[in-house]
Amino acid sequence: MRSRLLGAAVAAATVAGLLSVGVAGAGTRAETTVTITVQGRDFSGTVDSSRPLRCAKDRKVILYKQAGTVQDPTVDKKIASDVASLSSGKYRWSTGNTGIRGRFYARAPGTPECKADSSPTIHTTS
């Protein structure tokens, strides 16, 4: 009887250990990097990740017009959005001509598997 209880305890501890490893691994979200460029008032950029098929492919990117001195997606105005698609070996997004001047940044919101990222702020000059 004692050996049965000991065997059951070892089995339970093994299962608990495996479950905790699975949960810890599942909580690790991949880094994401968003870039932005502007030509005139045409915005475009790339999305990169260590897990490109999960975190760059078909990733939604939102273009914001920055209202204050720092980026704040809860306050800044959403101007356009696009979904990154593979082109010339990189996942690229583009909004086309927005017709708006100012300071802008692109943001890929976080997902359960991927961290959020925002590009640096850029200024349109023309």
Name these PLM-found stretches.
Residues 60-64:
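Beta-strand signatures of extracellular beta-sandwich domains
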